[in-house]
C-alpha cells in the first residue's frame, strides 16, 4: 500500500508542473490521444453491441449522456458565476482566460466507459479501460487544458453515474440461433439450434 501511495504521489508531482502549455511534440501527441480517448464510450458500446448486450449498451448511453449533461451544466454555471463576480478560481483553465474548466468533459467521457465496464463486466476487463481513462486525464493536464482537480472531479462524476446506472452483466444460459449449412451433395440445409449451459 505504501508503494502504491508513493507511486501515486510521484505521478502527481510529475504531472503537476506540466499544467501549462505543452512543451514538446510528445505533449501535443498526448493531447491528441486524449482527444480521441474521450470517445471511449463509443468504443466500449461497440463491444457491448457485438456481445449483443443491448441492456448494457442502453445503460452506457444513459450514464454517459447524464454525465456529460451534468458536466456541461456545471461548466456553464461556473462560467456564469465568474461573470457575476463570484470567486471560482478552481474553474479557470490553466491555459487561457476561460472559466469553463471545471469539471473536465474529456475525463467524464473516458471514465463513463471505465466505470461502466467495471460495474457491468467486472474489474479484470475494466483494467485496460481504466488505464486509458487515466491516460486521458493525464493528457488534459499535460496539455494545460485542466488542472488535476478538474480532471479528478470529472472522473468522479462519471464514475458515480456509472455506479448508479449500470447493472451487473448476466449472460443468458440458453441461446436460440439459426443454422445454415450445406451437406456433402451441396444442398442447402436450414435449421434452428438451441443450446443450454448447466
Swiss-Prot record:
In this organism most lipid A is tetraacylated without a phosphate group at the 4'-position and a phosphoethanolamine residue at the 1-position. InterPro entries: P_Acid_Pase_2/haloperoxi_sf (IPR036938), P_Acid_Pase_2/haloperoxidase (IPR000326). Disruption phenotype: Loss of Kdo(2)-lipid A 4'-phosphatase activity, accumulation of 4'-phosphate hexaacylated lipid A. 360-fold decrease in resistance to cationic antimicrobial peptide (CAMP) polymyxin B (PMB), increased cell-surface binding of CAMP, 20-fold decrease in resistance to endogenous antibacterial peptide Hp (rplA). Lipopolysaccharide (LPS) from the deleted strain induces the human innate immune response via Toll-like receptor 4 (TLR4) 6-fold in cultured cells (similar effects are seen with mouse cells, has no effect on TLR2-mediated induction). Keywords: Antibiotic resistance, Cell inner membrane, Cell membrane, Hydrolase, Lipid A biosynthesis, Lipid biosynthesis, Lipid metabolism, Lipopolysaccharide biosynthesis, Membrane, Transmembrane, Transmembrane helix, Virulence. Removes the 4'-phosphate group from tetra- and hexaacylated lipid A species, has no 1-phosphatase or Kdo hydrolase activity. Absence of the 4'-phosphate group renders the bacteria resistant to host-derived cationic antimicrobial peptides (CAMP), allowing it to camouflage itself from the host innate immune response, and plays a critical role in the long-term colonization of the host's stomach. This is Lipid A 4'-phosphatase. Pathway: Bacterial outer membrane biogenesis; LPS lipid A biosynthesis. The gene is lpxF.
